[in-house]
Amino acid sequence: MQPVRFGSPWIMAIGLVLLLLAFVSAGKSRQRSPANCPTIKLKRQWGGKPSLGLHYQVRPIRYVVIHHTVTGECSGLLKCAEILQNMQAYHQNELDFNDISYNFLIGNDGIVYEGTGWGLRGAHTYGYNAIGTGIAFIGNFVDKLPSDAALQAAKDLLACGVQQGELSEDYALIAGSQVISTQSPGLTLYNEIQEWPHWLSNP
């Protein structure tokens, strides 16, 4: 049996196969890479207090419920943190909630703030807290839209949630006003989200 020499056709063929496999593997890795998740400030970063009770959500989550906070708007950690701290205190102390009621909140500069996050139930929408993620835009959006940065951050958060397995790939997007007695997320924002993917007109 002749020894295999460097530069022989066999070595060259094996090298080409390995090179091809490397390209295929790299392509698959790029396809599996997570979406560009938005900047998310964790609860400890905005000065949030620990939850008073731990009620976990079953994931992947089936519903996303959009709200607005009916507060002033904010940009930047300092201003948004003040609003969030006051909101959490009101929800825990006055409404007897375990935590701030929303899973995520979005400032007008497009920064996302962790509320109860993906893992814990919020208290945003009766009947949907255990099966839905509540996302609230900080501000009042009856007569106007959130900024483009805030809207894009919400879309990026949803795409990121699907990529990471937190949201079901066929999740349904709804407004709070569709399922409970509230004007949230405000008429103008309500009209906007009807054009988003996964919108469910009759929940």
Swiss-Prot record:
SMART domains the UniProt entry points to: Ami_2 (SM00644), PGRP (SM00701)
Record annotation: effect of changing H68A: Abolishes L,D-carboxypeptidase activity on DAP-type PGN
GO biological process assignments: defense response to Gram-positive bacterium; innate immune response; peptidoglycan catabolic process; positive regulation of biosynthetic process of antibacterial peptides active against Gram-positive bacteria; proteolysis; response to peptidoglycan; Toll receptor ligand protein activation cascade
Name listed for the protein in its UniProt record: Peptidoglycan-recognition protein SA
Keywords recorded for this protein, A-Z: Disulfide bond, Hydrolase, Immunity, Innate immunity, Protease, Secreted, Signal
Gene induction: Strongly up-regulated by PGN from B.subtilis. Regulated by both imd/Relish and Toll pathways.
Catalyzed chemical reaction(s): N-acetyl-D-glucosaminyl-N-acetylmuramoyl-L-alanyl-meso-2,6-diaminoheptanedioyl-D-alanine + H2O = N-acetyl-D-glucosaminyl-N-acetylmuramoyl-L-alanyl-meso-2,6-diaminoheptanedioate + D-alanine
Site (Interacts with peptidoglycan): T182
Domain of life of the native organism: Eukaryota
EC number assigned by the record: 3.4.17.13
Gene assigned in the entry: PGRP-SA
Region span, Peptidoglycan binding: 87-90, 97-102
Listed CDD domains: PGRP (cd06583)
Family the UniProt entry places it in: Belongs to the N-acetylmuramoyl-L-alanine amidase 2 family.
Major location (coarse): secreted
Organism whose genome encodes this protein: Drosophila melanogaster (Fruit fly)
Effect annotated for changing Y126A: Strongly reduces PGN-binding and activation of Toll pathway
